[in-house]
């Protein structure tokens, strides 16, 4: 082990056996990531929890009594934070976590194994919530192919689908937050969001790795969706 420029001990993983270089680098990054260690100490399911904590500390979009939908929720780091902030465990607010993968139970969170891309998904969700959501969150990322342009289009397409779903389940004045990656492929997405929301901005929490193009689009002040205009 050696110290890095911050004075912290840096763990180096030896390459041996069948371990690939990519696996070695990923393991080293995890072992030396302070957010990974802090998440374990604080009981969060993933380091991603700190991204939502930081964004909400600054912008205050999660409030007691709100109803929150977490798309692609597994393993549940964002659902944990949302449940705590809206008071779901005390019955003040509600958090609905949606994913195709099973997810261990979280106190105060209702889990739905559901494909949000299915045409019937908005109606099923609205029936579960008995009303519209105040906030829709998405920390999803599309499966990558290794081809940069293809991956960018896949990621933007996923967020566009999440935004379309949101327009069916979000109440006027609500908030939509989704993970995106910095590229020139999201122009259409921004046009869509600026049409449907009063304010649209990009944010990059400190917990997002600095060498990553990851950032979040935050859309606030929902103008009302297709259901409201029928």
Swiss-Prot record:
Gene Ontology MF annotations? rRNA (uridine-2'-O-)-methyltransferase activity
Q: What is its EC number?
A: 2.1.1.166
One Pfam family of this chain: FtsJ
Q: Which GO terms describe its cellular component?
A: cytoplasm
Question: Where in the cell is the protein located?
Answer: Cytoplasm
Taxonomically, which superkingdom? Bacteria
Checking SUPFAM superfamilies in the record gives:
S-adenosyl-L-methionine-dependent methyltransferases
Please name the InterPro entries in this protein's record: RNA_methyltr_RlmE (IPR050082), RNA_MeTrfase_FtsJ_dom (IPR002877), rRNA-MeTfrase_E (IPR015507), SAM-dependent_MTases_sf (IPR029063)
According to its UniProt record, which residues of this chain constitute the active site?
A: 179 (proton acceptor)
> Where on this chain does S-adenosyl-L-methionine bind?
76, 78, 99, 115, 139
Catalytic activity line of the entry: uridine(2552) in 23S rRNA + S-adenosyl-L-methionine = 2'-O-methyluridine(2552) in 23S rRNA + S-adenosyl-L-homocysteine + H(+)
User: Any idea which UniProt keywords this protein has?
Assistant: Cytoplasm, Methyltransferase, rRNA processing, S-adenosyl-L-methionine, Transferase
Principal place where this protein is found?
cytoplasm
Q: What does this protein do?
A: Specifically methylates the uridine in position 2552 of 23S rRNA at the 2'-O position of the ribose in the fully assembled 50S ribosomal subunit.
Q: What family is it from? A: Belongs to the class I-like SAM-binding methyltransferase superfamily. RNA methyltransferase RlmE family.
Query: Can you say what this protein is called?
Result: Ribosomal RNA large subunit methyltransferase E
Organism of origin is: Nitrobacter winogradskyi (strain ATCC 25391 / DSM 10237 / CIP 104748 / NCIMB 11846 / Nb-255)
Gene name, per UniProt, is: rlmE
């Amino acid at each position: 082990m050696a110290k890095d420029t911050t004075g912290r001990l840096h763990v180096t993983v030896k390459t041996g056996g069948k371990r690939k270089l990519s696996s070695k680098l990923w393991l080293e990054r995890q072992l030396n990531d302070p957010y990974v260690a802090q998440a374990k100490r604080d009981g969060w399911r993933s380091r991603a929890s700190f991204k939502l904590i930081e964004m909400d500390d600054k912008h205050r979009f999660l409030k007691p009594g709100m109803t929150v939908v977490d798309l692609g929720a597994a393993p549940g780091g964002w659902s944990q934070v949302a449940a705590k902030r809206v008071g779901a465990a005390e019955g003040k607010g509600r958090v609905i976590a949606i994913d195709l993968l099973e997810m261990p139970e979280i106190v105060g969170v209702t889990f739905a194994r559901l494909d949000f891309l299915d045409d019937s998904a908005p109606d099923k969700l609205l029936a579960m919530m008995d009303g519209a959501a105040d906030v829709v969150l998405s920390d999803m990322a599309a499966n990558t192919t290794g081809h940069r342009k293809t991956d960018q289009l896949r990621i933007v397409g996923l967020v566009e689908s999440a935004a379309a779903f949101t327009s069916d389940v979000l109440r006027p004045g609500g908030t939509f937050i989704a993970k995106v990656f910095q590229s020139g492929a999201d122009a259409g997405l921004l046009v869509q969001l600026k049409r449907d929301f009063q304010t649209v901005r990009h944010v990059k929490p400190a917990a997002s790795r600095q060498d990553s193009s990851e950032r979040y689009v935050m859309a606030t002040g929902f103008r009302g969706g297709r259901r409201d205009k029928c």
